[in-house]
Structure formats: structure tokens, C-alpha cells
Amino acid sequence: MTKHILIISSELFSLINFRSSLIKYLIDCGHRVTALVPKEEYNNEDSIQKLKSMGVIFKSYSLSRAGLNPFKDYLSYKSICFVISQCKPDIVIAYTAKPVIYAGMAMKHFPKISFFPLITGLGYGFTEGDGVKRKLIRQLMIILYRKGLKSSESIIFQNPDDKKLFYKLKIILRNMSSHIVHGSGVDLDLYPFSPLPKKPIFLMLARLLIDKGVREYAEAARIVKAQFPKVIFQLAGRLDSNPSTISSNELNFWINEGFIQYLGEISSVQKSLTSCRFYVLPSYREGTPRSVLEAMATGRPVITTDTPGCRETVID
């Protein structure tokens, strides 16, 4: 039976790079797919056209992705409610914290619609740290997740640690349906195996957040290059509005000191992976790190951390 499926995203980049295979599958099965993206990204015509060519319908909504302004978050909630009332989908899929929480809260007004939240990682509030701000955000997120997940038909996790933590914090109850999917998957046609290059190039690809282990990577680069100056440490990704972001001054210091080669925000992940010999992700916590899966598909040795999400990618 054909369904109308609404997918709520916090950014267009992840919708195209992480969900396009799922969207294509749903459309190939005969379902109608509407994608909801933040208003500020709605003008990215090239990216939107890629999904429109597959048959995706686009809508926009108000979202402050990393902000803590309650008025803006209330606008996100009302905006999602409005789109759902207009689209009248049969199924709503939301991923990342704010879309999951506010879509979940909206679902109490639409009891006949099935809601499937995807927990792709827990972010700043749930990583280790003793700061007052982090603790307050964590407590707020616990309360909001409890409210947002009440209306879910089934909750989809990407690793068992996140699921256990949600049980421990009583965010979800044992009788609530849930599944673990171990990541978003990688299209092996887009990330084929390639021979290792001869140059000793290490690559880290991530948003430039402290919680991603960017500082640890830079410090490791400094230590190694002091003894082996021909080794290259590349860093790719953007500065972010997240509370855990590093400063541009810190990034420029690493670049000027010569131990980090900064690639900026790259358009071709596959090309950068093909050029490196080792892939590194020293993250504090992930859902299931897509970049690690892509690196493995390409045939790159991976150095990552024994932390939730990351540990699932490695058989030790």
C-alpha cells in the first residue's frame, strides 16, 4: 500500500549524503516522499534539485540547529506542526535531536500518523564533561527527549550504548518498541575499494568540534611530525555553531605551526579518502560514524576510539 512519508532533517547536507539511498528505496517502492529542511538551506538549488530529480517534494521550516533560544525552538515546534497538518503524511521520520524532539511533541496532535525517530547520536549534552552548561543542557535534553519520544511507534538507534543510556535515564521505557540498525549504510558503488597511496597521509573528516576529538588529532599530529616531518595530517570539515566548536584562532594556530593541513569543507569525501593512507576519528561519542564506514569501504586502515558508536565499527 502506497504511503506518504515525511522526512524531517536538520540540514540539507545530511539529507543528501546520508539519506538519499533510503529516499530512493522508498520512492522505488511506490511511496511518496516529502523532505522538510531548514529555511536557510532551502535556497541551495543545486542540492535540492538532486533530490527533486528523484521525485522528492520539498518543504521548509524554522530551525535554529544548535541554538538555545526557547522562542526559536517554539517556532520550530509550531512550524513542524503546520507542515504536518498541511502535508497529512502517513509516516513521519525525524533524525537528529531537535527534529526528533519537536516532531515527537507535534505528534500528540496527529495520533493517526506513525512516528519513527532515528537517534543518530546524542551530541554535546551527552558527552563526558563537568561544565555547568553541559550539565544543564543534558538535563534539559533528557526532559525533552522523554516528551518527544512518547508518541513514537518505534525508536531507531544506531548503537546499543545509546539505547542502554536511554533506558538508564528513563527517557524510554522497556515496553516501548525500538530497533538498532548500526548506521546509515554506505553505497559501495560510490565508495569502491582503492589501493593505498604511498604517501603517509592521515585524514580526519568531521565538524570541527572538541567532542569529535579534533584537539587530540592536532596534538597527535604535532607529536608525530616532530619526529617524522614527512608525515601529513589532513583535517577536513567546517567550523560549527555547536557549543563544542573550536575557535578559528585555534585552527589557524595549527595551520600556521605546520602540523595540520586544513582542507576546509570538502565536496568529495570519496576523493579525499582515496588520497589518504590512514583514516582517524578520535570522537567522544557517535551514533555510528558514517565517515569510518566510508573509509573502511574504501579500504583504509582506521584509527578510532573505544566509545559509543565508534567501537561498533571495529572488531577488537
Which role does the model predict for each range below?
Residues I16-S21, M204, L209-I223, L293:
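A conserved mid-protein helix/loop that constitutes part of the nucleotide-sugar donor-binding site
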Residues F18, F71-K78, S114-F116, Y124-S151, ...:
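Nucleotide-sugar donor phosphate/pyrophosphate-binding loop at the beta->alpha transition
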Residues L36-N43, L205, I232-I246, Y262:
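Glycosyltransferase donor-sugar binding loop
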Residues P301-T304, V314:
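Short hydrophobic beta-strand element within catalytic cores of glycosyltransferases
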